[in-house]
Amino acid sequence: MSTEEQNGVPLQRGSEFIADDVTSNKSNNTRRMLVKEYRKIGRGAFGTVVQAYLTQDKKNWLGPFAIKKVPAHTEYKSRELQILRIADHPNIVKLQYFFTHLSPQDNKVYQHLAMECLPETLQIEINRYVTNKLEMPLKHIRLYTYQIARGMLYLHGLGVCHRDIKPSNVLVDPETGVLKICDFGSAKKLEHNQPSISYICSRFYRAPELIIGCTQYTTQIDIWGLGCVMGEMLIGKAIFQGQEPLLQLREIAKLLGPPDKRFIFFSNPAYDGPLFSKPLFSGSSQQRFEKYFGHSGPDGIDLLMKILVYEPQQRLSPRRILAHQFFNELRNDDTFLPRGFTEPIKLPNLFDFNDFELQILGEFADKIKPTKVAE
């Protein structure tokens, strides 16, 4: 059998096994199927991801799927499966099948989540522009940021917090402009007055309240992550790169100014770390945003300044983000030019809100839809 190296890890093409309990997420029917793994496409904190195909008869193959393998009988496995089983949204990766299998390598049982497969992550797309010393087109940044916010509108409406929003946890198809949030290994349904661990979310995208140890946080930590991802698309690198958790707060203070003592107290009264109370730059925070993100235009700067805010309750909600004027170009022009194309194509459908979304949007629906759609 031939081998291929993906992310430095060789994997035999054609490695296969029989799974006895392959359950369809759509029909709930369970059957015995052959699983043929093709190549490794990712590795996360809670498991690995391979591209694979499924078949009952070795003639009719289903896939390709992105199959995430995580140790069975863990709290994270249980949460991720529960969330993916109910999630049904164009900007959330779709679970197609799930099953368990005893690994011959370590004799442990693994949960396998077979999800739809998209060509690459947003991190890869950002890196491609950086490698070629190019800026990602502003239309693409609008398109991707909008879809992340729309996915969050749905998730947060369910009470689910992703808790690890970053470019490598967002899938994209650059040829169609479609984006889907993936990797729900850290996701959790937040309950009012129920504490959650603060050491969550990858450091560069961690909201300030998490850095100082808040355990009563809200889904607004995802909004902070969205702002970090948007900023990274604009400048080609993570905007806050602290080399350790507390230094991450210093990096944030370089852009936003020092955190308010009230914010510190209400996030975690027991916090006794550095406050970075002295200004780390001259001029205003507005000037700092303009220096770093000026090419996003006044609307882009305005949006970022309303997302990257210390106080969680002051960050824009998903519906207010979707209604922001930064996305007016998506409402006024329904085409974009994919990388490598010579002619523009239609944008993916951005305004086909279902009843659940419309209920959350309320009066904002008419502000978000293009006039011709709203009518």
UniProtKB/Swiss-Prot annotation:
Tell me which residues bear N-acetylserine.
Answer: S2
- An example of a Pfam family matching this protein is Pkinase
Recorded hits in CDD domains, A to Z, give:
STKc_GSK3
- Catalysed reaction per UniProt? L-seryl-[protein] + ATP = O-phospho-L-seryl-[protein] + ADP + H(+); L-threonyl-[protein] + ATP = O-phospho-L-threonyl-[protein] + ADP + H(+); L-tyrosyl-[protein] + ATP = O-phospho-L-tyrosyl-[protein] + ADP + H(+)
- Per the record, the domain of life is Eukaryota
Q: Where does ATP bind?
A: I41, G42, R43, G44, A45, F46, G47, T48, V49, K68
Catalytic center residues: D164
Q: What is this protein called?
A: Protein kinase MCK1
- Give the source species: Saccharomyces cerevisiae (strain ATCC 204508 / S288c)
